[in-house]
A protein has these predicted regions:
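Active-site acidic/histidine proton-transfer and metal-coordination neighborhood
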Residues: 11, 73-234
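A short beta-strand-loop structural module common to alpha/beta enzyme folds
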Residues: 27-37
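Conserved beta-strand positions in the central sheet of alpha/beta enzyme cores
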Residues: 28-30, 63, 103
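Active-site-adjacent substrate/metal-binding segments within catalytic domains
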Residues: 62-71, 77
Length: 234
């Protein structure tokens, strides 16, 4: 087991790599290219630039969270293969730069969700929190407005202002995507990326093999994943 810390990049994180380096036992960071839109290919040059910045601090890039999945893939539109091809190329480039762990999610519209971004603990510290009852009281179209008041300048993955400006379009886009359809599209996606991304290493991709880890809130149970993609998970 390795101790790591999430790092949002020098442009977006108030915590510096120098500060992270001082935490006992922490040897790496989990990060991403926060200024790269879902669906775009991550070039080896950009990946190396990110790695070099981290390694100069005495840490290393332990993994990526996330290479975001384009909405066309989740919804299953006619152009999804273009974005899946871009995703595969990104995984290959990460592997060639010696980064072999990628976390992704397949959650619709809002990416990951919290009901509070700064719940106060008894010791005075603050933490993220999730309460389904609170979420149920929020009108979906107003969720960004409700949550953003506590962001304090932080840009949450999947909650970028330019994305949330189109929240009504996103709801329209996903209106016919029920649980079954979402899992069908997940199956299609996993079967496409598995040769490079899900523990199955072919000769073509051997040098760039990458392990992909699905975010838990996708609500994928082991049996469903095994059925969907024949991907062995622990």
């Amino acid at each position: 087991m390795e101790m790591t810390l999430r790092w949002y990049g020098s442009k977006f994180d108030t915590v510096t790599l120098k500060q992270i380096r001082q935490i006992p036992g922490v040897t790496g960071v989990i990060t991403t290219l926060y200024d790269t839109a879902p669906g775009e290919v991550w070039s080896r040059e950009r990946i190396k630039e990110m790695k070099d910045e981290v390694e100069k601090s005495g840490l290393h890039v332990s993994g990526i969270e996330s290479v975001n999945v384009h909405d066309a893939i989740k919804v299953g539109t006619s152009d999804r293969d273009k974005y899946i091809d871009n995703y595969i190329e990104t995984l290959e480039n990460l592997g060639k730069e010696d980064i072999h762990l990628v976390c992704y999610n397949f959650m619709p519209v809002f990416d990951w969700t919290r009901s509070e971004l700064a719940r106060k603990r008894p010791d005075g510290s603050t933490v993220l929190a999730y309460n389904q009852d609170d979420i149920d009281k929020i009108v979906p179209e107003k969720m960004f407005e409700s949550i953003s008041k506590d962001m304090n300048g932080t840009v949450m993955p999947g909650w970028e202002p330019e994305r949330m400006e189109k929240v009504k379009e996103l709801f329209e886009m996903y209106k016919d995507v029920d649980d079954e359809k979402l899992f069908e599209n997940l199956k299609y996606f996993l079967e496409r990326i598995m040769p490079v991304g899900c523990f199955l290493v072919s000769a073509r991709y051997h040098a760039a093999a990458v392990s992909c880890v699905s975010h838990g809130r996708i609500t994928v149970y082991p049996g469903i994943l095994l059925k969907a993609a024949k991907c062995s998970i622990g």
